Design a protein with these regions (language model features):
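Active-site acid/base region of carbohydrate-active enzymes
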Residues: 19-93, 106-157
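Membrane-interface helix-loop-helix modules in multi-pass inner-membrane proteins
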Residues: 2-3, 54
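Well-ordered alpha-helical segments within folded domains of soluble proteins
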Residues: 3-14, 88-103, 164-169
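Polar, glycine-rich mid-to-C-terminal structural blocks
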Residues: 152-153, 157, 161-165, 169
Length: 169
């Protein structure tokens, strides 16, 4: 089945900030423990949902509307694969949230500065890939429509799937 978007870091960061505001105490032990689990989870996403290794993600997850025009987790009848704008956006957000957590942990443990830099760099790779998949000039963004679309790859050809939904916002 479809996987749900990687919102773990966003949720942990929100819980941490709300608790800190409510109690006046920064419980970084919680943040650090969950951060290490999310490092493993992030690696799973990169290894399983970026099968082409180009920082554009696929694999069926939606999250906002959860209703696709077709089953994005099943093999396509035409072969090929779909580069998903929503999945790629979710992973960009995951990077930014992990970076924020690493920066918070770096306040007392400078070793996390390098980890924060890693997530900033990965975010930049994702942003670049959305505008130039694998350096081939293929974009998820459509300048004319001012909208992000999924891209269907079959063999050496590609085409934007111009179906407007929450996916492209």
């Amino acid at each position: 089945g479809d996987v749900n978007p990687p919102v773990h870091a966003w949720a942990a960061w929100r819980v941490y900030k709300i608790d800190k505001k409510h109690t006046g105490v920064a419980v970084t032990d919680f943040l650090e423990r969950i951060f290490h689990k999310m490092l493993l989870n992030f690696t799973w996403w990169v290894n399983r949902k970026d099968t082409e290794g180009n920082n554009v993600f696929e694999g069926g997850f939606l999250g906002l509307d959860n209703i696709g025009v077709f089953d994005r987790s099943s093999p396509l009848p035409t072969g090929g694969h779909i580069e998903q704008s929503d999945g790629t956006s979710w992973m960009g957000m995951y990077c930014l949230n992990l970076m924020a957590i690493a920066l918070e942990l770096a306040r007392t443990q400078p070793a996390y500065e390098d980890v924060a830099t890693k997530f900033f760099e990965h975010f930049m790779y994702i942003a670049e890939a959305m505008n130039n998949i694998a350096g081939e000039g293929i974009e998820l963004w459509d300048d004319q429509d001012e909208f992000f679309y999924d891209v269907l790859h079959v063999g050496n050809s590609h085409m934007r799937l111009k179906a407007r939904s929450m996916v492209g916002l």
